[in-house]
Amino acid sequence: MNVKFFCNRGMNLLEYQVNEWIEVNEVEVINISFCTETYGYSTTYYCSVLYK
């Protein structure tokens, strides 16, 4: 199973939670939110992850 993150560069995946799990064109896509430390504080980003 290959996992590909569609997010900005320079983000460290510290923790994440699954918000949504859907199938698009026979490809499973989940929307997750995760926290990354940038300049001393944590920020939550949202992105999609493809599982093949």
Residues covered by each model-derived region:
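Short secondary-structure junctions
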Residues: 22-30
